[in-house]
Amino acid sequence: VTTGPGTPTGAEAGPRGVRARPDATDRALIRAARLGDDLAFRQIVDRYGPQMYRYAVRLVGGSESDAAEAVQEAFISAWRGLDAFRGESSLRTWLFRLVHRRAVDLQRKRKPTPVTDEALTGLVAPAVDNALQHVLDEELLHELQAALNELPWQQRAAWLLREVEEHSYEEIGEALGVPVSSVRGLLHRGRRTLAERMSRWR
C-alpha cells in the first residue's frame, strides 16, 4: 500500500528533521508525520495497513482490487487529514473509519459482490462452534458464504470488526459512526442470523 500522491519524500521531511523510531507510539508517529516525516507515515501504513486490508477485503465480498483501492484511498485521506486528527479516538479506530467509508463508497458505485470461499476460509473458526472448526468442507463454506451475504452491510461490518479484528464495542461504534447501543443491536441481529443459517452444523 502506498500513501498516495502528495506524500513528501525523505528530502522534504519536516523542518526539525524528526524521524520516528520503529517502536514509536502512534502519538509520536502522528507528531512526526505532521512535521513532514514521510517515514513516520510509512510506519503507520506498515503498522495498520495489513489489518485494514484484511477487514476491507472481507467487507467488500472478497474483491482484492476493491479492498486495495479502499485502503489506498483511506491512507491518502489520512495523510491529507493529519492536522484534523484530534486524538479523540485511537489512530487505529480513525483509520478503520476511513477505510470503512471508502469501502462503502465503492460498493455504492458497484453491484454487491458475494463473499468468496477464499475470504471465508479465515472466518470459519469464529463463526461456528469449536466442535466444527475442523469441518472446512465445501458445503460448510458455501452455507456460511450465503449467510454472510444475507447480512445487511452494517451487520456484516460490525461482525467482522468484532469477531475477526477483535475491536471493542466502543471502537466499532466510532468506526461505523453509531452509538454502542446500536453496535450491540447490530451484533445481536447478525449473530442470530448466522446462528439460524448455520444451525444444522451445530
Language model: regions and residue ranges:
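Structural recognition of an alpha-helix C-terminal capping motif at a helix-to-coil junction
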Residues: 69-76, 89-101, 185
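N-terminal module of bacterial RNA polymerase sigma factors
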Residues: 1-51, 125, 149, 196
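Amphipathic, Lys/Arg- and hydrophobic-enriched alpha-helical face
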Residues: 45-64, 81, 148, 193, ...
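Internal acidic/polar
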Residues: 14-15, 19-26, 113-141, 168
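DNA-recognition helix of helix-turn-helix
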Residues: 100, 104, 144, 155, ...
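Arg/Lys-rich amphipathic alpha helix in sigma70-family domain 2
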Residues: 80-87, 97-117, 137, 198-200
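Sigma70-family region 2
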Residues: 34-35, 58-62, 73-90, 109-111
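Short, charged helix-capping/linker segments at alpha-helix termini
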Residues: 19, 34-43, 54-73, 180, ...
